[in-house]
Amino acid sequence: MMNQDIKTIIQYPVGDVEFDIPFDYLSRKFVRVYLVSPLNRRQLNNITEYRYVSRTRIKLLVETAGFNLIEIRRFTSASERVVDFSDGSVLRATDLNVSQLQSAHIAEEARDAAMLTISPADDGSLDASGKVIKNVGTPVQSSDAATKGYVDTAVSPLATTIEANFMRTLRTSGRSIRELPGASEVAGMLLGFNGEGDPVPVVAGEGTASDVMLKLAGTTGLSYIGGVGYVTPEMMTVDGKTLVRGLGQDHVRFIQKAIDEGHRRNVPVILSGGYEVYETLHDAPLPRDDGTAYPEWVANGGDSNIRPEEQLYQKAHLRLYNNSVILGAGSQIATIRSTWARSTSAVGLTSPIMWYIEGPLGNRGTVSYVLKGIKTIGAYIGRYVVGISYRSVEDDLEFAGCGIAGVKQGEEQTIHRKIVITAYAGDVTGGWWLQRNNAYGAKYMPPYTDTDVWLLGWCDSSTYEYLSYTGYDYDGRDALVHDWISEWFDTYIFKTANSRKVSEGGRLTYQSANPYPLPTLKGITGRARYITSRYSRQNALNVINTLKTLITIRAPGYMDNSTQSCRILNAMIESVGLIRRTSGANAGNYFGIDVVDKWGADTGVWGLEGTGILEKQLVVFLRPGVPCTNAVVATGAGQIFESWTTTNAQRRLLALRDWNPATQVQTYRYDFRTDYALMRPTRYYTDGPLWNYSKGTSTPTVAVNGSTIAVQKAVTNWYRLGDIMRCNIYVEINSITLQGNSELTVTTPSFNGSWEVAGQGIGKVYLSTLTGGVTLTPVIQQGGNVVRLRKGSSPEVYAFEAGTYNNVVLIIGIDYVPLS
């Protein structure tokens, strides 16, 4: 800390952009600005690296990475006079004052500079004020000061010798002891002392005192004397004090010390009552990218590395580690309360996390933990998990009066047995912006390649046996907090702005190995569960067995990029999509209709928006316009899919599709909707959707009375859509001379063995030589490929009259059902 008596030099910690100048000065050129670190300082240039906002305030224009302080000091020139007197000039008081002030400034700065140098302390010694003294010469006399390098060089051999000797030495007070035998002679024996007090090896016989001592020294020794294999905050002492309840004591350091001790000893931490926490001991890292692009994309010139994002942190009370086990006496007994209040607290980087959980590899690895039997009250974020939660267990957890129950980078094989939430948002998994490549393969992940796609933050096999969620109305201050929380998540976690290309002000690479578009963030509040894949990697097997919700302004569940294995099996969903629950399902009280959702309207069913399946649900108080679905098994009727809604808007009831992992092709088969059903003609490759018609062309032949004739143009175009084949035949004949009653037929390979039934086809015929009032119908025999022309619906074959016909055009369009 700088001496408070120093007036012409001020230092500020970095982090802000604008800084005050607390002292007066005669000219801006007498003010100097520096970036300072413990080992470096850099003077900044006015205009290009900082500018004046006002006479008493400056604004930085450069990055402060690598420095921890901003220093502003006055350095008045002793040679460059502000006022210069000459003979015969008018002598004014103002000039005299300025001249005197310049001298005073110089003297004041000299005094401040002296106070920053080595100065006498009260006891007569010299005080360097905690600064490093450099350029010290090699000591000559025993009383001379020595450099660290000199001391290290002199002490190192001695320390090595002492350490080597002490490793083979037993020490006693006031006497010498004799040397022990070698290691091979004392292995497996205890150390005893003879009558003279010298150490001697002792054989540890079974059942002897010596044997007991060996067992007590083992890893299970505590169990032999009735010891406990756990720790509690009540066992800990902090600054000589023990934990006391009911007196407003901050319990955070007692709990953290117990967590640290439990982690060190690999034993659980037991929480048995109510705890209050105020101090935020930890800085939890928020997501950021390192600025790098996939090296091959940089090498080919399409992309380049950019500056890394600034590392920001969220304040946290408690830190859990890999394999931490926290066991409460039950969520009705073991409570832990923070200070965040929905009615008064802000939403920002200082809003506290209760449980910050991170493993040794951070966001490039997994973390496993157990959290049971605890009620968390008044935390902005209940659990904040850096890395992929792997095989973690949560049970009997309650979160009350929180902003977000959980924010997690990802989950794999994590089970949540009973989770009860009263908060603006439930558990939010995924969506962390941790790298800037538009891809989701490991080779595209920093440090190129990563051992797995940790930075994508996937969510697979996350199961909730029972999840209860109660939200808050979108009204008054609660409406503001809803918006603040979604904005916080977008600003610091999801970072929608980063999805734009660099040239558009974002951070996404220009090149892509991602066949799918990056997802759009929806509002995270007013939902029990939110799963999103930031880079479009698929999420699979995320299941909620039983869901109970009350007051969800949005669809209670949201999942994107998920497979059909993601399901909510049973649900009771009450008061959905209402602005105020007490006002009921009435006009003017619908969120998303009467109040526009800033993050986009819900498009899925009320139980589950995005992708996934909601199997059974009971809905009370439903916002109109959004459907609900059930899938139930009826006795004697197989599987029945039920659907209902409060409007008649057209919507999908059921879709069937299949996926071929070998060819990476996803084909949509059938789409059943409320007003029609169809077979969708699309399939999806990694490069996007393609038409999935079976189609082709062939060359037909034209015959008159069975004899083939020459034509100028003949082509058949055919394609298949579901169970229907459609065939279009086009023929041009420049000139043809016919005898009376001549029959013209067309043979096309497109029909080989394909016609299912004999008789007339469904189609039309255009013939340029037809006279008015005559219509023709195309006919094909079963299994044949010859098209004959008949008059209207009669069996009469159309026959040409004798004569020469020029510029004949024949067009036949026919639909038929194929045999296969």
Swiss-Prot record:
Record's keyword terms, sorted: Degradation of host capsule during virus entry, Degradation of host cell envelope components during virus entry, Host-virus interaction, Viral attachment to host adhesion receptor, Viral attachment to host cell, Viral tail protein, Virion, Virus entry into host cell
Gene Ontology cellular-component terms listed: virus tail
Complexes and interactors: Homotrimer.
InterPro entries, per database record: Phage_T7_tail_fibre-like_N (IPR005604)
Pfam families: Phage_T7_tail (PF03906)
Subcellular location: Virion
GO biological process: adhesion receptor-mediated virion attachment to host cell; symbiont entry into host cell via disruption of host cell envelope; symbiont entry into host cell via disruption of host cell glycocalyx
UniProt comment concerning the protein's domains: The N-terminus anchors the RBP to the virion. The central part and C-terminus probably binds and degrades the host exopolysaccharides.
UniProt organism field: Klebsiella phage KN1-1 (Bacteriophage KN1-1)
Family listed: In the N-terminal section; belongs to the Teseptimavirus fiber family.
Principal subcellular localization: virion
Protein name, per record: Depolymerase, capsule KN1-specific
Role description: Functions as a receptor binding protein (RBP) and probably mediates the attachment to the host capsular exopolysaccharides. Displays a depolymerase activity that specifically degrades the KN1-type polysaccharides of Klebsiella pneumoniae capsule, which allows the phage to reach the host cell membrane and bind the entry receptor.
